[in-house]
């Protein structure tokens, strides 16, 4: 769990990722913590976020079951630190991506559902067995998009509860995308903390992904 001083530095004014040897002129704790250092991230930020993502897996599972009772399990993989360019290359389009404003975090956070998961969820919801006829679609159908809009909106309380272990946020969906290339809030060189979740629905497995910008502290609203 991050200490209050660390949270203030991460999300508040003065969080510039700087390190100083003097603590007399530290304002809000921002200069005490080098958020950009790998050592700091491994020792503090990633463990805190790992707890968030473990809670998120359980919360999403419970909420998804309200829509698709055959969702058996969701398991979170280890957090991977990746450049946005890598995320774009490794995420096939279409994917159902939601950008969420998460005050008081200083930058959006994201959930991305791979196409196979979208097709399987929609097929089960409408009474099928998850045997989607889609091999590779250029985009989602209107009914698939409407279903995912409703599903992702219903996940907001689960996201709030999961983040409560680290910081209280109020997530609100800002945008929906079907391709990471159209996410204009991120630059290719931006560093992200990425967690993949494997969703088991009957005999099918598919993935969704949580994306948290590493540099949220440097993008905080002033």
Q: What label would you give each PLM region?
A:
Residues 1-222:
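N-terminal auxiliary interaction/assembly segments of multi-subunit proteins
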């Amino acid at each position: 769990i991050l200490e209050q001083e660390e949270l203030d530095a991460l999300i508040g004014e003065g969080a510039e990722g700087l390190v100083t040897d003097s603590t007399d002129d530290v304002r809000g704790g921002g200069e005490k913590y080098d958020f950009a250092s790998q050592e700091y991230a491994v020792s503090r930020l990633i463990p805190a976020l790992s707890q968030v993502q473990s809670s998120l897996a359980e919360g999403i599972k419970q909420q998804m079951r309200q829509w698709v009772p055959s969702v058996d399990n969701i398991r979170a993989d280890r957090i991977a630190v990746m450049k946005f360019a890598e995320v774009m290359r490794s995420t096939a389009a279409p994917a159902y991506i939601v950008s969420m404003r998460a005050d008081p975090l200083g930058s959006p956070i994201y959930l991305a559902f791979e196409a196979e998961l979208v097709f399987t969820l929609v097929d089960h919801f409408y009474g099928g067995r998850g045997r989607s006829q889609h091999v590779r679609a250029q985009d989602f159908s209107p009914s698939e998009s409407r279903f995912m809009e409703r599903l992702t909106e219903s996940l907001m309380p689960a996201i709030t509860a999961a983040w409560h272990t680290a910081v209280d946020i109020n997530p609100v969906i800002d945008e929906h995308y079907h391709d990471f290339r159209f996410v204009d809030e991120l630059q290719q060189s931006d560093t992200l903390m990425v967690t993949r979740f494997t969703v088991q629905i009957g005999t099918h497995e598919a993935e969704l992904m949580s994306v948290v910008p590493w540099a949220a502290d440097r993008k905080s609203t002033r």
